[in-house]
Amino acid sequence: MSQPTDEADKSTGNAQVTHESINFANFNQDSTCVSVGYQSGYKIFNVEPFTKCLSLADTSIGIVEMLFSSSLVAIVGLGELPDSSPRKLKVFNTKRRSIICELTFPTSILAVKMNRERMVVLLEDTIYIYDINTMRILHTIETPSNPEGLIALSSSTENNILAYPSPPKLPNRQETSTKGTTNDNDRSHLENIPENVNANSSNLRNGDVIIFNSHTLQPISVIEAHKAQLSAIALSSDGTLLATASNKGTIVRVFDVETGVKLYQFRRGTYPTKIYCLSFSQDNRFVCASSATETVHIFRLGQDEANNTMPSRWSKNQKLALQRYKQSMKQXQGSKPSSLVDSDSDPDVDELVENDNSDDDELEEDIDDELAEERFNSSLTVPRRVSSTTSLGSYGSQESIGDKIEPHVDSARRSVARMIRRTSQSLGRKAAEKMGPYLHPKFSSLLEPNRHFASLKVPASKDTKTVVAIGNSVGQGELLQLGEHEDVDNSSSTSDSTFHQKLLHVMVVSSEGFFYNFGLDTERGGDCTLLSQYSLLTDVNDG
């Protein structure tokens, strides 16, 4: 799910300079529309084709959320007057241009999420759940401080799942990691921390996620996602998968919501960064992550990636080998395997020469995090993802299909830095093959982790906030445009029709005020190609 963006910088790139700025941007539940809040109103855009379908002048808007493509919109202001207070939520009918209801809360509203059955309003320390058909309040949940406004609601009413951060807790407490329960007011989980323990202690786990059934209004489980504090969470549209990232920004994990089992783990990069947004494709074949590096990474949820993540039992000899190897890493400073010092987060050369003294501690924390959850995962029957003929290569090994399919490389992104990283990853794979039999499988996966299937570079300033979504297949008209920007492999006999079926929209909205539309090759992966871009900073009163 996407997150609200802060006020944009005054720099607008190639766009026409205006006095307008963006307070908020998000995709709707099926990624067919974008809602944008400005200093003087809000707009709603259709993404395919990209057109403005609604523009309303108003006060400064901090949140504008859609209910799919219906006329119902939830609006929260950013003004100082009572009518535009950030504590007031207005549910608006855009077709009738009328307010359905107004709700006032004790503190500022940080997020609003909706599906066809529920509306969820998040304050810093409270969650309110409403029946969206009657706007009657059904339930309240008291939570620990959540200033980042992290919350996710599935768009499906079949699996009406709500996810939000759990309070910190001691990692050595003997609790079932995915069977946490709470009482009606959901306060019992706040007792995880003894009174004499400082909540800011480095010994506490801050990255757990509570799974809540919004239909039955009952908590389901607590998923131990990360040791560090959460930075982003997202639920798949059908409510079956949960994606998480911590404030380190190096690891993205995907869990089965029903069982709490970790299905996938991906390494975004080695250097810490801020992950702004996680988002699943509608068919759960991909999950994408946008970050402060201006790079969006797309990870494939296939069988090969699952096999490289699944826990397995290991012998005492492997345990001892792991301990010896960890000790040798502490003693030999600066002698890390090549694959542990590369970074896929940004193709810029300066990232390769950045100080990386913190890598050892982060790697050790990743290992400890993996070993801590082994006690639970090894006792579960892990569900296997079933191969699908509609996956276009997502499930199963590429080599098993025939010759290995090389990823698409954008000539505009070729650089010495990227060549060094590719060489480093190749050396890492060879090291993993030789050392794998002697290491715990979790540590072996750190030597040769799942990495991104595809990526794209957003033409934006560093630390520009972005939200991202994966849409439908690219149309034939856009393929003609795509052909103007890239050279098609002469050895490929793929027809335009087949090529069309292989490409998906990857859409990015930046806080600088741009909408970017990229093409993702679902079979080859690699670099996504920029198809089009549009400015969102035209006069908000022009519609």
Swiss-Prot record:
UniProt KW tRNA processing keyword: no
Biased amino acid composition, Acidic residues: 343-372
Motif interval(s): L/FRRG motif: 266-270
Keyword Membrane: yes
One Gene Ontology cellular component annotation held by this UniProt entry: vacuolar membrane
Segments annotated as WD repeats: 225-265, 270-309
Region of interest (Disordered), residue spans: 163-200, 326-408
Mode of membrane association: Peripheral membrane protein
A Gene Ontology biological process term: protein transport
Pfam families in alphabetical order: PROPPIN (PF21032)
Keywords annotated in UniProt: Autophagy, Endosome, Membrane, Protein transport, Repeat, Transport, Vacuole, WD repeat
Domain of life, per lineage: Eukaryota
InterPro entries per the UniProt record, alphabetical: PROPPIN, WD40/YVTN_repeat-like_dom_sf, WD40_repeat_dom_sf, WD40_rpt
Composition-biased stretches (Polar residues): 173-183, 326-336, 377-400
Main location: membrane
Compartments, record wording: Preautophagosomal structure membrane; Vacuole membrane; Endosome membrane
Domains (record comment): The N-terminus might form a beta-propeller domain involved in specific binding to phosphatidylinositol 3,5-bisphosphate (PIP2), leading to the association of the protein to the membrane.
Biological role stated in the UniProt entry: The PI(3,5)P2 regulatory complex regulates both the synthesis and turnover of phosphatidylinositol 3,5-bisphosphate (PtdIns(3,5)P2). Necessary for proper vacuole morphology. Plays an important role in osmotically-induced vacuole fragmentation. Involved in correct ATG9 trafficking to the pre-autophagosomal structure. Might also be involved in premeiotic DNA replication. Required for cytoplasm to vacuole transport (Cvt) vesicle formation, autophagy, glucose-induced micropexophagy and ethanol-induced macropexophagy. Required for the involution of the vacuole that occurs during micropexophagy.
Family: Belongs to the WD repeat PROPPIN family.
Subunit and partners: Component of the PI(3,5)P2 regulatory complex.
UniProt protein name: Autophagy-related protein 18
Organism of provenance: Komagataella pastoris
Taxonomic classification: Eukaryota, Fungi, Dikarya, Ascomycota, Saccharomycotina
